[in-house]
Curated annotation (Swiss-Prot):
Gene name in the database record: queC
Keyword Nucleotide-binding: yes
The protein, known as: 7-cyano-7-deazaguanine synthase
Function: Catalyzes the ATP-dependent conversion of 7-carboxy-7-deazaguanine (CDG) to 7-cyano-7-deazaguanine (preQ(0)).
Organism listed in the record: Methanococcus maripaludis (strain C5 / ATCC BAA-1333)
Residues holding ATP: 7-17
Catalyzed chemical reaction(s): 7-carboxy-7-deazaguanine + NH4(+) + ATP = 7-cyano-7-deazaguanine + ADP + phosphate + H2O + H(+)
Record keyword Zinc present: yes
NCBIfam families per UniProt: 7-cyano-7-deazaguanine synthase QueC
Length: 233
């Protein structure tokens, strides 16, 4: 069985790749270059994780997105929320809008679908999850359902996108990742990269962007030692 894993190198996609590995899929991983500030770090993480999982890794260039994106992920204007803001819907929604890349997931998953059909893979594994689905509309079960409906008409082999984490929050994702590492006797999570910035050192996180804040909280609430190095703890 073949599968494509959309692998940004972050915690969610790293754990999703472990899920695919645990289900005995022959994995091909894809990382997208959409002109994001953290691109080099994301690629390094994705390459390392792919190597550990014995997966072919491809970087796909969709850098044209940068031409019309005003996202902080492209411009470097990254919001730095307070810890108590993470569960405040209005503040989280404001942060979401600041980093929203126009139609990013739609573009990436559409290309991944073509890749999957081309290599006769039956599934696309994505790291969409419940916590990010609160504010990001393209992380919701509704998005997954409707995207898969379009694949019924847009692909001949009826490839399907799956999101094994869509019912989980970040602490549950961290916990699942640790369980899968032990089950598969692999070490992946410490090589994942969640930060919105490139901090000039491999796997070094800023510790202040929303993604870093959620990562910190995930390990703490899961009761798991955080293997991440942060500029600001």
């Amino acid at each position: 069985m073949k599968a494509i894993c959309v692998l940004s190198g972050g915690l969610d996609s790293a754990v999703t790749s472990l899920v695919a590995k645990s289900e005995n899929y022959d994995i091909t991983t894809v990382t997208f270059n959409y002109g994001q500030m953290a691109l080099n770090q994301e690629i390094k993480s994705a390459e390392k994780i792919s190597e550990i999982l014995n997966a072919d890794h491809h970087v796909i260039d969709i850098n044209f997105v940068k031409e019309f994106s005003k996202s902080g992920l492209n411009t470097g204007n990254i919001p730095e929320p307070e810890k108590e803001d993470l569960d405040d819907f209005e503040k989280s929604e404001k942060t979401m809008k600041a980093v929203w890349v126009p139609a990013r997931n739609m573009i990436m998953f559409s290309i991944a679908s073509g890749f999957a059909e081309g290599i006769d893979a039956e599934k696309i594994f994505s790291g969409l999850n419940r916590e990010e689905g609160v504010t990001f509309p393209d992380n919701t079960p509704e998005f997954i359902e409707r995207f898969n409906k379009s694949l019924e008409y847009g692909t001949l082999n009826k490839v399907k996108m799956v999101a094994p984490l869509y019912e989980l929050n970040k602490p549950e994702i961290a916990k699942l990742g640790k369980e899968l590492e032990l089950k598969l006797d692999l070490e992946v999570i410490k090589y994942s990269y969640s930060c919105y910035r490139d901090n000039g050192e491999d796997y070094l996180h800023c510790g202040t962007c929303e993604s870093c804040m959620r990562r910190k909280r995930a390990f703490k609430e899961a009761g798991i030692v955080d293997p991440t190095k942060y500029l600001v703890e």
